[in-house]
Structure formats: C-alpha cells, structure tokens
Amino acid sequence: GDALLAASIQRAGNVFLASRYESTGAAAPLPAYVRRSTAPDPGAAATTLQSAQHPIPSLGAVAAGVGHVYAEPDNDGRVRQIPLLLRYDSVGVPSLALLAVQHSLHLGLDDLRALDASEGLRLGGLNIPTNAGVMLRPRWQVSGDSAATFPTLSAASVLDGTAPAGSLKGKIVLVGEMTDAPGAAAARVEERLVHPVEVLAQAVSSMRLGLGVVEPAWAMPVTWLVLAL
C-alpha cells in the first residue's frame, strides 16, 4: 500500500516525484513538500501555469524532491523545448529532469544560478544552455533503427529479480509508462511518437552531456523576416 511505498521512498533517500501542471484550472498554493524543491521566481519570461496536481502528501513528504514534467508541443505537434523552471505561486518550479541532474552531481538547488538570458543556467560547474524563458532545447538523440534510444527494463523484471544484476547501480533511473495502448500519452519528437518518460530521458541526457541547442540572438528577427516575406 501507500505506507509501504512511502517507507521505501524514505529509506532510499534518492527518489524524486512529479507534479503535473496545466494552463487552466483553479490555482492553489503549493504544498510544503513541493515548495521545498523550488527556486526563486524566474520572472515573467518563464512559462506561467495556472493549476497543478501533486503526489499524495504521504509520498511527497518523504521524497527527495518534487518537480514538474510539463512540455508543451509546438504548433506542428513536435516537442522541441522543455521549461527547466515553471513560474507558479511566485516561485520557480524545477523540472524533474533538472532535479535528477542536480542530484546526480551531488548538488542542491542552492547551487543553481541564472546567468545572462543568452547564457542559461549554471548548476555547480555545469553550464546548461537555455533561453530567457529558461527553456532547454535538447539535442534529441534518436537511434537509427527501431531500437530504444536508452536502455529500458520492465517493472516486472526489476520486481521479480530477473533484471541483470547491477543494471541499475550508479544510474539515473526514470520510471514511467511505455504502453502502446490507444490513448496512451505520447509526444512527437522528430518524426516519431515517444512516451513522456523518453522526453524526460532526453532532457536529462542533454544536460549531463552538454548537448543543448543554443538559439542565436538573431534567430527570432530572422524568423520574423521570413514570415514577412
């Protein structure tokens, strides 16, 4: 039950959970177990959202942190950028990917510093390229065939002990649904549909490997010029 799961999360000490944010709905203050993971208000340029759904208090209170998994596709349905900080309730809510990277580097959010708008964020000694809206544009890694871009294990193989010994040791482990059932959540990356946990993995990988795409300062005026033509 929830009590056993909460005890396991607390014992591990390295489990981060996700909240879901929406642009509509009734606003409510962040609960304390979410607010403790937040950063200072990132300003009006950051993505501002209206409502949120959080983990139940018994789990959120014992988690190492709670972050968001929000990613809004462009008009063509493709996900090209991910907000590393959302603006909600006058604070910056970090993405689950940012919390995972921060923890893997043995750092805290006190080590996160905003640089100039054109330079992004600095997490300890790691530079993370973002735009003024604190958006990361991952350099999407896509395998050349139908194979998964990142190693995957079924939950059943982990729980019953048939997963290879040590396969999770020293790794950032992301847990998420990867069903192909009709109606399952998916995002379009490049030319294919991927599950939200894969988008999360791409963001983590881009930050750790320094593979973010930097948008030059002249990109937006050029876009306007092309559209004007």
PLM feature spans:
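Surface-exposed ligand/attachment interfaces on beta-rich extracellular proteins
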Residues: 156-165
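Short intrinsically disordered coil segments
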Residues: 99-100, 153-157
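Non-transmembrane functional regions of envelope-associated proteins
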Residues: 1-127, 165-229
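Active-site Gly/Thr loop motif
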Residues: 130-154
